């Protein structure tokens, strides 16, 4: 059973899943596959692959970063809830907000949270560029993003939401360090400073992952993020 595989792999890292948490992951998989038939949530639907490439992959950052405590976490472009919902299941005290530009995905997440009995979660239908200009600007302890865009673009979408003293966790594939070289200029302009990069392999040769931890040292200038679409079309790079 894939849930037993996940439980065993997490146990090796010192994370013990309760029966309730195991049931939540099993329900999550079931709902993901059901809803995926009517909307495009994921191309990965095989049970073991979901447990490995979505659930385990989402939780792996916690092997290197402490998510314990009542931390506020904003997840940008989480799609079907990765990485923040698996993290919320394992660390129930997290206060999670997911921002996604597609309303259908927000509907799925609302249904998912209700079915899993998750508290302190909210789902916002908005563009990150707009959300980063609003009342929640510079209000989160942690902002995460996984497989959304290149790091230069992600930095402009995510760093404005991080409070001073908080951190942006960029979850990347094997190209993270390469993207980081390009993104250093943008990170600095936006008030960030690269703290650390962790590189690790998923089990079963499922790929290399990198987690880049960026400290928020200074407030972000009010001109960022720029209007929707601009960060992607004209990334902040040194001219």
UniProtKB/Swiss-Prot annotation:
Where is it localised? Cytoplasm
Q: Which InterPro entries match?
A: rRNA_ssu_MeTfrase_G, SAM-dependent_MTases_sf
Q: Which residues bind S-adenosyl-L-methionine?
A: 77, 82, 128-129, 146
Alphabetically sorted, this entry's keywords are:
Cytoplasm, Methyltransferase, rRNA processing, S-adenosyl-L-methionine, Transferase
Q: Which domain of life is it from?
A: Bacteria
| Disordered: annotated segments | 217-239
The record's GO molecular-function terms, alphabetically, read: rRNA (guanine-N7-)-methyltransferase activity
Enzyme Commission no = 2.1.1.-
Check the record and name the Pfam families matching this protein. Answer: GidB
Q: Please provide, in alphabetical order, the Gene Ontology terms of the cellular component aspect for this entry.
A: cytosol
- Tell me the protein family, please: Belongs to the methyltransferase superfamily. RNA methyltransferase RsmG family.
The entry's function note states:
Specifically methylates the N7 position of guanine in position 535 of 16S rRNA.
Give the protein's recorded name: Ribosomal RNA small subunit methyltransferase G
């Amino acid at each position: 059973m894939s849930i037993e595989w996940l439980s065993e792999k997490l146990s090796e890292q010192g994370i013990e899943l309760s029966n309730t948490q195991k049931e939540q992951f099993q329900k999550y998989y079931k709902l993901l596959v059901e809803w995926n038939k009517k909307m495009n949530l994921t191309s990965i639907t095989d049970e073991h692959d979901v447990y490995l490439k979505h659930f385990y992959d989402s939780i792996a950052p916690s092997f290197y970063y402490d998510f314990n405590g009542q931390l506020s976490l904003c997840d940008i472009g989480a799609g079907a809830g990765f990485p923040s919902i698996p993290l919320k299941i394992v660390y129930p005290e997290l206060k999670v907000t997911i921002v996604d530009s597609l309303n259908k995905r927000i509907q799925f997440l609302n249904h998912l949270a209700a079915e899993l009995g998750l508290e302190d979660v909210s789902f916002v239908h908005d563009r990150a560029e707009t959300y980063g200009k609003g009342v929640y600007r510079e209000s989160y302890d942690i902002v995460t993003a996984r497989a959304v865009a290149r790091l230069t673009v992600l930095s402009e979408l995510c760093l404005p939401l991080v409070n001073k003293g908080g951190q942006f966790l960029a979850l990347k594939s094997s190209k993270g360090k390469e993207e980081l070289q390009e993104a250093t200029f943008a990170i600095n302009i936006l008030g960030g400073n690269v703290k650390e990069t962790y590189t690790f392999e998923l089990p079963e040769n499922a790929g290399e992952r990198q987690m880049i931890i960026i400290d928020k040292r200074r407030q972000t200038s009010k001109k960022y993020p720029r209007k929707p679409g601009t960060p992607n079309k004209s990334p902040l790079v040194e001219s």
